[in-house]
Amino acid sequence: EFHARFSAVRRYYNYRTRTNTFLLDRNYTWPVGSIDLDTLNEAASIIGGNHDFTAFSRHTEDLEHRRCIIYDSVWKEKGAVVNYQVSGNRFLHHMVRYLVGTMIEISRGKYEMAQFKQLINEPVENLNIYKAPPQGLVLTQVDYD
């Protein structure tokens, strides 16, 4: 039987950030100031594949496992708007926001790439990462079998 949530095989998210402030866009983007796009894409490339995202989810969920397959993970710049585009078979609660927040902190030099890699490769419950605000996050597409 079809279920809108559980029958999905792939989900696509877009997270919009801005490198400047534009008041009319403040409810739909996160103004992050200057960022290093190359660093963001280096971090985004680490996410691809089949990983346990325990470190990047809320821990109130009673889940059998926290593994997700990430098919695409890339940052794209268009003027002052920098979009993070990610697709995967599933996403944990707040996972995209935790990933975006942590990658932005890496870009700002406030978090180490090595720590990020370790959280992906050796997952632990982690309360010391930054969660991006909800503004900017959009579910753009869902694929069904």
Predicted regions and their residues:
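Structured-RNA-binding interfaces characteristic of tRNA pseudouridine synthases
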Residues: 1-145
